């Protein structure tokens, strides 16, 4: 064994061994308990970043640990390979998205191997290949036949200059990112999947997910947004149709003083025919993209349509306004306004001088003061005719019942969740498998024409999708009739909604899933990824699983038993102010810093001499130029060091602060482990350990070894506090480094301890452990070695520490045998000088003894 720890030599050798032996390839095995460990698959952007490394290290630690417990562990990896960034990169680099993507995959695959992750590479998949997306296309046609897919018009961002649809992130300050033309909102037909048909199940089954973070479940509950309320119909004077609104507060209905409709509502459109002000307002709304997050903060505007609706219970006429805070795609595109008891309605009514009518008493029973704001709390009704004096619940039911009896109301359950729009007017995605026949009939692409292959050899102009620009691509024949293919592609969330299931049978040719393999491996035992995916991906992931279950492919209700959301990776961020006042961000690698005695940064400059402003730790990002390249760190310290630091520096679900000093510390620790094994093995063969012949000191050291095994097992397996597991191993290493190694049993005990340490470290630092296991002559490869088991007998304490008090004040701490009697403890306490001096010449009036813990002598 060489004396120096040289990761650059051992890591590549061990990785080659894993490749040649196919160590981590697995198949279904009914005789073994399975464990499916999955990290969210990466987008092949070109290089791994530290966020990836953290995510995949956590997954690999768990997978290797479970493997050592004797389970059949599946840990696959693949590539979420479709998406908009590839189009931009292709234009910039004068290539096509496909070669750019495949080059990135090859590069990043090598980076993953360099980090030593134990993946089953035989199951690797890329979502941009027809072998993958053909099954997604087939599944979509099946959903269409079941009535779970439909087409309707929906608003998109449209650049009139480029004649193209823009993704939200391509709209900068209301203008096209490419040509700076003002972006318009345009209604175009798009495909939707009915996720709302599963809303109740998606909501209720959150209660089954005991091992998902509460934050994620709460976010999904709010996103689904189930509410119970009443749908109310209003007659409108001089208008052919009625208006329908939905409210969760029918108890406030007697305070409804106006209605508001979306700018795109047919009533607003009709009113605009003779109202230029309204027509201009509708135009303004049409070209304003409004995300829900912006709705709360934007200025509320509106125009009176001139129409009057009739309040069904009071018979009063109330005005109908067009307002920018009502969206056509939400609910009915019309809302009732109760400005006395809703703050948004209050602000709008105050701005435009509309009637504000209070109908709920304040908590003290007085009439509410509405001079500054609405009263939004629930309470007792007044000013409400026959409903006066009713509390919230009674009023809700009474008003709902009356409206229902009159035929103008109906109790309804509503959801905030909208159906999933899966059409994207982009090129680099899976083609949507639908066709339109010459006679206008729309139908799914027949099975014998699947997959609809996306051509990869294309020229990108950065404006129009190549499959939209080429009229020939869309032409096909169905049932002998000319037809045109759909030229939109799927939302890339489609591919990432079912990849986890395809990993169980990536070569299967007969269908989307081989049910036998899928049901052996599924559900996923632990799924690891960022909390930013809480509502979109993780909701679609759950939805798709239920769709596949209902298609008979899987027999579980949920895709993953446990979800672990790893924290972000932070790094120092620095900038200097340029000549034009702009911020120039400088990589922390290039910052020369001065620190105070507490290690805090007090001054910084770069190599060019710029004084740098230190903004603290923030998420590693391109915008702040504070990302640290994992590859550079692996080349400098080795993969094991980077992995160990990642798992030690912070709990897995908390933010991690990147500190190179911490990386150096992890590296020093691994050098110490190497040195101890080197010194131990240099002394030659080791005798067998005789546990019955150990001295007290040897027993104490062996007790520490086995207590550490017990703690590390609990920390990794149950608590998933990996940082405390590593801390416990480090503490044990400090004791081993000081332990005597001269005697035969000293060395036998050291052998037992080092074999345990190397196995406990193996999930974290597999390359060094693989090598040290061989040097220690462990049995077989460490990858097939069992996890160490704590010896209960070894952990039993022979002695215990008893606190001795005189009149309640601590005077000594004594070590006594665990089976010592009260008399023996008193006798031993009396031998302590500090106790004896307080007992001299006094009478012991009372003795309080808590066996093995406390002796209190009361004297007087």
Swiss-Prot record:
A motif ('KMSKS' region) lies at residues 619-623. GO terms for cellular component: cytosol. Its EC number is 6.1.1.4. A motif ('HIGH' region) lies at residues 42-52. It is found in: Cytoplasm. InterPro entries: aa-tRNA-synth_I_CS, aa-tRNA-synth_Ia, Leu-tRNA-ligase, Leu_tRNA-synth_edit, M/V/L/I-tRNA-synth_anticd-bd, Methionyl/Leucyl_tRNA_Synth, Rossmann-like_a/b/a_fold, tRNAsynth_Ia_anticodon-bd. GO terms for molecular function: aminoacyl-tRNA deacylase activity; ATP binding; leucine-tRNA ligase activity. GO terms for biological process: leucyl-tRNA aminoacylation. ATP binds at residue 622. It catalyses: tRNA(Leu) + L-leucine + ATP = L-leucyl-tRNA(Leu) + AMP + diphosphate. Keywords: Aminoacyl-tRNA synthetase, ATP-binding, Cytoplasm, Ligase, Nucleotide-binding, Protein biosynthesis. It holds the Pfam family Anticodon_1. Its main location: cytoplasm. The keyword ATP-binding applies. It comes from the Bacteria. Belongs to the class-I aminoacyl-tRNA synthetase family. This is Leucine--tRNA ligase. The lineage of its organism: Bacteria, Pseudomonadati, Pseudomonadota, Gammaproteobacteria, Enterobacterales. The gene is leuS.
């Amino acid at each position: 064994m060489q004396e120096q720890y040289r990761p650059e030599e051992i890591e590549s050798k061990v990785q080659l061994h894993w490749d040649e032996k196919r160590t981590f390839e697995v198949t279904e095995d009914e005789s073994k308990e399975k464990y499916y460990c999955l990290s969210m698959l990466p987008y092949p952007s070109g290089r791994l970043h530290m966020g990836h490394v953290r995510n995949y290290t956590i997954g690999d630690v768990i997978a290797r640990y479970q493997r050592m417990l004797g389970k059949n562990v599946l840990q696959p990896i693949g590539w979420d390979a479709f998406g908009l960034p590839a189009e931009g990169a292709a234009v910039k680099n004068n290539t096509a998205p496909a070669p750019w993507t495949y080059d990135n995959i090859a590069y990043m695959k090598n980076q993953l191997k360099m980090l030593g992750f134990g993946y089953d590479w035989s199951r690797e998949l890329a979502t941009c290949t027809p072998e993958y997306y053909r099954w997604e296309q087939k599944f979509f046609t099946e959903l269409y036949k079941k009535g779970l897919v439909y087409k309707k018009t929906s608003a998109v961002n449209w650049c009139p200059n480029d004649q193209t649809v823009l993704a939200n992130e391509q709209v900068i300050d209301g203008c096209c990112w490419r040509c700076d033309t003002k972006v318009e909102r345009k209604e175009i037909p798009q495909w939707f999947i009915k996720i709302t048909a599963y809303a109740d199940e998606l909501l209720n089954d959150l209660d089954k997910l005991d091992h998902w973070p509460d934050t994620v479940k709460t976010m999904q509950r709010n996103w689904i947004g189930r509410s119970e309320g009443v749908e109310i119909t209003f007659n409108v004077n001089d208008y052919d149709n009625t208006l329908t609104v939905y409210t969760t507060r029918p108890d406030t209905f007697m305070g409804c003083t106006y209605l508001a409709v979306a700018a795109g509502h047919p009533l607003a459109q009709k009113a605009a025919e003779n109202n230029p002000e309204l027509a201009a307002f509708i135009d303004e709304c049409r070209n304003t993209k409004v995300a829900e997050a912006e709705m709360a903060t934007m200025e509320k505007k509106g125009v009176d349509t001139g129409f009057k609706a009739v309040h069904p219970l009071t018979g009063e006429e109330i005005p109908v306004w067009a307002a920018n805070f009502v969206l056509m795609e939400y609910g009915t595109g019309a809302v009732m306004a109760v400005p006395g008891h809703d703050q948004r309605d209050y602000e709008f009514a105050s701005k435009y001088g509309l009637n504000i009518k209070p109908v709920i008493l304040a908590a003290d029973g007085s009439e509410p003061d509405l001079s500054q704001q609405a009263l939004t709390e629930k309470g007792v009704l007044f000013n409400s005719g026959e409903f006066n004096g009713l509390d919230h619940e009674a009023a809700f039911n009474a008003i709902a019942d009356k409206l229902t009896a009159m035929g103008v109301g109906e109790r309804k359950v509503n959801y905030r969740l909208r159906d999933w729009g899966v059409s994207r007017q982009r090129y680099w995605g899976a083609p949507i498998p639908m066709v339109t026949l010459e006679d206008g009939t729309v139908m799914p692409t027949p099975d014998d024409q699947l997959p609809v292959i996306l051509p990869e050899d294309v020229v990108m102009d950065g404006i129009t999708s190549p499959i939209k620009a080429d009229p020939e691509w869309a032409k096909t024949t169905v049932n002998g009739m000319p037809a045109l293919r759909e030229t939109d592609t799927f939302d890339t969330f489609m591919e990432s909604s079912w990849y986890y299931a395809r990993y169980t049978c990536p070569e299967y040719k007969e269908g989307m899933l081989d049910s036998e393999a899928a049901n052996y491996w599924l559900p996923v035992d632990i799924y690891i990824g960022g909390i930013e995916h809480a509502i979109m991906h993780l909701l679609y992931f759950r939805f798709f699983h239920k769709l596949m279950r209902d298609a008979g492919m899987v027999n579980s209700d949920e895709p993953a038993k446990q979800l672990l959301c790893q924290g972000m990776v932070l790094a120092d961020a620095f900038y200097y102010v340029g000549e034009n006042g702009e911020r120039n961000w400088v990589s922390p690698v290039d910052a020369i810093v001065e620190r105070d005695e507490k290690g805090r940064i007090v001054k910084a400059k770069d190599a060019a001499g710029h004084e740098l402003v230190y903004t603290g730790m923030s998420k590693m990002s391109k915008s702040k130029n504070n990302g640290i390249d994992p590859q550079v760190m692996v080349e400098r310290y080795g993969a094991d060091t980077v992995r160990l630091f990642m798992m030690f520096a912070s709990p897995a679900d908390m933010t991690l602060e990147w500190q190179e000093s911490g990386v150096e510390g992890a590296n020093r620790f691994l050098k110490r482990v190497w040195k101890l094994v080197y010194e131990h093995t240099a002394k030659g063969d080791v005798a067998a350990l005789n546990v019955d012949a150990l001295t007290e000191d040897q027993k104490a050291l062996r007790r520490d070894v086995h207590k550490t095994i017990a703690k590390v097992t609990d920390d990794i397996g149950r608590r998933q506090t990996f940082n405390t597991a590593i801390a416990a191993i480090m503490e044990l290493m400090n004791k081993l480094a000081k332990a005597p190694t001269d005697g035969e049993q000293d060395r036998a005990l050291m052998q037992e301890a080092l074999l345990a340490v190397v196995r406990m470290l193996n999930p974290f630092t597999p390359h060094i452990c693989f090598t040290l296991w061989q040097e220690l002559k462990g049995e077989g490869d460490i990858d097939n070695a069992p996890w160490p088991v704590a010896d209960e007998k070894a952990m039993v304490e022979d002695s215990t520490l008893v606190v001795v008090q005189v009149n309640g004040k601590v005077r000594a701490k004594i070590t006594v045998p665990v089976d010592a009697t009260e008399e023996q403890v008193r006798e031993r306490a009396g031998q302590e000088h500090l106790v004896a001096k307080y007992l001299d010449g006094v009478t012991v009036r009372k003795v309080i003894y808590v066996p093995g813990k406390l002796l209190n002598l009361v004297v007087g």
